[in-house]
Structures are given as structure tokens and as C-alpha cells.
From Swiss-Prot:
The modification Phosphoserine is found at S56. Binds specifically to cytosolic chaperonin (c-CPN) and transfers target proteins to it. Binds to nascent polypeptide chain and promotes folding in an environment in which there are many competing pathways for nonnative proteins. Represses the transcriptional activity of MYC. Keywords: Acetylation, Chaperone, Nucleus, Phosphoprotein. It comes from Pongo abelii. Its main location: nucleus. Heterohexamer of two PFD-alpha type and four PFD-beta type subunits. The modification N-acetylalanine is found at A2. This is Prefoldin subunit 5. The gene is PFDN5.
Length: 154
């Protein structure tokens, strides 16, 4: 369990360390959300592609991707069944409707994960802002103290 720290009791180097830690946490959470969005977009695109599979397109010629930049000609033979990548190199044959349901569940799961991360990211942003404001306040205090000492010596 995380312990609560009163930032008013920390000195400038400690505040700087805390700010750096919060920067890293914000970066990690932001990257996590971005990665989840990329995966979610791929699932949305895959689900949308299933809408092209219908009886009127059966027998039509198409380009089949072998890699991200290499395609070979092919014919759409079976519009009722598809192979979907379920991860780690495994593919499963499903009906087009089952595949749409699979992608919908994945999209919903990723949305929920992003919704769980978002509040933590906002909390870290707020904490970082509070630390930066405290640092500014301490710097102003030190500057004022230094100016007061300089005028007292003069």
C-alpha cells in the first residue's frame, strides 16, 4: 500500500526526485493507453472488414496479404467462415458472425482497460502539478530569503 507524503515537508531535491518519479509514471500510463488504443484500432478495423464478406462478393478476386508489404492475388471462396488470429501465432476458424462477436468482446475489454487506467493517469498528472507548484513556492521563498539577507548585509 502506498504511503501518503506531505509535500510541504519535502525539500527541493526531494521534490525534484518525486517529480521525476511522477514523470516516469505518467509516461508509462500514457504509453500503456496509447498501446491499448493501437490494438483496439486493429480490432475495430478487423471487425469492419468482416462487413465486406457477403454472398455478393463471393468469387471475386482480391489481394491477399502475405506480409505488411507483399500481396498475392486470390479469390474470395467462402464468405461464411474466417480465420482469426487469437494470439501467439494461433488461428481459429469461426463464422463471420462469431468473429464479429469475438472482435466486439476484445474492443469492449480494451475500452474497459483504458477506462481503468485513465483515472490513475489523471491522478498522477494532478500530483505532478501539485509538486511543481510546491517547488515554485519553495524557490520563491528561497529567493525572497536570499534577497532579504542581501539587503540586511548592505
Amino acid at each position: 500500500m502506498a504511503q501518503s507524503i506531505n509535500i510541504t515537508e519535502l525539500n527541493l531535491p526531494q521534490l525534484e526526485m518525486l517529480k521525476n518519479q511522477l514523470d516516469q509514471e505518467v509516461e508509462f500510463l500514457s504509453t500503456s493507453i496509447a498501446q491499448l488504443k493501437v490494438v483496439q484500432t486493429k480490432y475495430v478495423e478487423a471487425k469492419d472488414c468482416l462487413n465486406v464478406l457477403n454472398k455478393s462478393n463471393e468469387g471475386k478476386e482480391l489481394l491477399v496479404p502475405l506480409t505488411s508489404s507483399m500481396y498475392v492475388p486470390g479469390k474470395l471462396h467462402d464468405v461464411e467462415h474466417v480465420l482469426i488470429d487469437v494470439g501467439t501465432g494461433y488461428y481459429v476458424e469461426k463464422t463471420a458472425e462469431d468473429a464479429k462477436d469475438f472482435f466486439k468482446r476484445k474492443i469492449d475489454f480494451l475500452t474497459k482497460q483504458m477506462e481503468k487506467i485513465q483515472p490513475a493517469l489523471q491522478e498522477k498528472h494532478a500530483m505532478k502539478q501539485a509538486v511543481m507548484e510546491m517547488m515554485s513556492q519553495k524557490i520563491r521563498q528561497l529567493t525572497a530569503l536570499g534577497a532579504a539577507q542581501a539587503t540586511a548585509k548592505a
